[in-house]
Amino acid sequence: MSKVRIAISVGDLNGVGIEIAIKAHEEVSKLCAPLYCINSYMLNQASTLLNYKIPSNFEISEVGGEFAVKKGCVDKDSGRYSYDSFIHAISLCEQKKADAVVTMPIHKEAWMLAGLKYKGHTDLLREHFKRDAIMMLGCQKMFVALFSEHIPLKDVASSIKYKKLKQFFLDFNNSVPNERVAVLGLNPHAGDNGVLGNEELIITKAIKSANKKVCFEQFIGPLVPDIAFTPHIREKFKYFIAMYHDQGLAPLKALYFDESINVSLNLPIIRTSVDHGTAFDIAYEKKAKTLSYINAIKSAIALGERL
């Protein structure tokens, strides 16, 4: 049986992504057939800076473009190349030349400097596929999906609309159909029956309606946010839905930073990613850890087996 073929988007080459890819290649090659979206010029430049030998079976799919790597720097050229690598990886999946995409970290400011309008991978995937992709992060011990992602905190409350939230729950069910899911409230004490805010009324209505639609009590809540990730609750739930970015990711990363990954749900392709940034502060210093990347590879393979 042939190995799963995974297109690797190399991320921002001024960061740690390419170090992780080369360092983990031997182990990853035992799990799948990785195809790295980079050209030989950029790969050789990065490997020289790292003083790493490129493995003989390090297969690349050429992505055009040449620039000087500026390790640890925010740069429009590296931003543009990380975008081009990602688009190339998506195209390989669409052409059935790859079974999944795994992404290394990009830098959002570098994308902005390159004139790109997207706030990140998930934002691009939504527009590319015209689907409401869901960002979910975590590991086998706990996963957290985000209702709102990269928006200012002041805009979160106004983003909580009944129809939008209900559809989010139903889209989540399409990807994770059989698991019970803990849904967090927005306000302290989950609003204290309206004393500290009314958004929980909207969340409750959306939960009830979605559960009726999926024909079982899949979504439970809204839970009081400050106790949602306590050991007692985590014994009952593996999946959580947070109303905003830091509400869900601060506890996740405090508990499982090194091993967590990022998964895009509700899409026609499989896409997983490392759950960390470009780590410019340690770029090309041979200090980057590979566990999140290896877990992202394993999850992409597992998701493919489920389809």
Swiss-Prot record:
The keyword NADP applies. Its EC number is 1.1.1.262. One of its GO terms (molecular function) is NAD binding. A divalent metal cation binds at H150, H189, H245. Substrate binds at H121, T122, K253, N262, R271. Its main location: cytoplasm. Its cofactor is Zn(2+); Mg(2+); Co(2+). It is found in: Cytoplasm. One of its GO terms (biological process) is pyridoxal phosphate biosynthetic process. Pathway: Cofactor biosynthesis; pyridoxine 5'-phosphate biosynthesis; pyridoxine 5'-phosphate from D-erythrose 4-phosphate: step 4/5. InterPro entries: PdxA_epsilonprot, PdxA_fam. Keywords: Cobalt, Cytoplasm, Magnesium, Metal-binding, NAD, NADP, Oxidoreductase, Pyridoxine biosynthesis, Zinc. PANTHER family: 4-HYDROXYTHREONINE-4-PHOSPHATE DEHYDROGENASE (PTHR30004), D-THREONATE 4-PHOSPHATE DEHYDROGENASE (PTHR30004:SF6). The active site is located at the dimer interface. Belongs to the PdxA family. Homodimer. This is 4-hydroxythreonine-4-phosphate dehydrogenase. It comes from Sulfurimonas denitrificans (strain ATCC 33889 / DSM 1251) (Thiomicrospira denitrificans (strain ATCC 33889 / DSM 1251)).
